[in-house]
Amino acid sequence: MRGSILSKATVIAATSLLALTACTTDSSIENPPAAETGAAGEATPAAGEPSESSAEWFDQAVFDEQDEQRSATFEGDPAQPYLQYIDGEMTDTSAFAADGAQKACFSNASISNPWRQTGWITMNQQLQVLQDSGVISEMETRDAQDDDNTQISDIDYFIAEGNCDAFIISPNSTAALTPAVERACETGKPVIVFDRGVQTDCAVTFIHPIGGFAWGIDTAEFLSERLEEGDKVVALRILPGVDVLEQRWAAAERIFEENGIDAVDYFTGADPVEIKSIISDELATGDVQGIWMDAGDGAVAAIEAFEDAGADLPVMTGEDEMSFLRKWEETGLDGLAPVYSNFQWRTPLLALEKIFAGEEIPAEWVLPQSPITEEERGEFLTANEGMPDGHYAKFGGEDLPGYPTVWQERQIP
């Protein structure tokens, strides 16, 4: 029996998490208000407040594993990164082989931010393909709107309904959702967990990019290689208590310390006004040579703060959101766009296709997670021309029906 999801890959969380906007077609969903609580309901420090130590989140074994995975060879076609995986233990799914179209039940944490919206659009276009091919009859979806209790009720509703041939679960948080995931497993139907993890190994597969430590290593090494000992980095963080975000900072902080970089971090709630205020205050006390972010929300505001102050632009890491890529090109700053591979939203449905065919799949399906470099930026800008600022460059849906219009128009089901 493989180890628990938590111990093998710690917890995977979304890149841009936990704004409280409900499922809606309102265009304002692109810029939801900042969350007031963390993933498990803990109070979030006031925006602009420095964080406490990240030591409790640092795990050397997981750090080393994800560092190694950054250079791993992935099985599968690089043109289909959403199907690639690192070679490892496989799950025999022959017991789940089925004839005819099957019903999927999807319990989603939310679509409350642009990263999740982009993935949700892609997932629905992938669903259309599998419906047309007769693999899936329908996907009944319940959106928890970033609330643990709602998602627990959603999963229990699916179980009581007794009409699901398979479960797909993107957990809102780790510990709180574990019992509900286990109850879904007890139905005897295949369960797929993706994006963020839970503390059980009962799922047929856990799908996620490499992880938070890999993000932290990519970004902190990039900044450290370009800065000198004693240079100052301002780290902008969305909120505390979300494992993958904490892991990003835990890895980055360790690397900054090793390289003598003076790094100070603040929680921002992804509020552009607060981000500008933090940076303005830091610039008023001295030079800032680098900006590090645990997610790209507010990256443009950070750059604009330097422009408003007439200060030299920093070395900076953002994310593969189009707003950052465009501002990066416009300003010519020295930057890197780390990713939390948005194309992962296709993988659960493609995994179901394999499961219903009785094919083996990875027990832990680790997807590629490669940042966008300056040399690659132009390629991704061209490929995503016409996409809205909230779109994510590595969304992986170019071969799906509706491309590019569905994503350009942000047609959120």
PLM regions and their residue ranges:
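Sec-dependent bacterial lipoprotein signal peptides
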Residues: 1-21
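A residue-level marker of the well-folded mature domains of exported/periplasmic proteins
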Residues: 2-5, 22-413
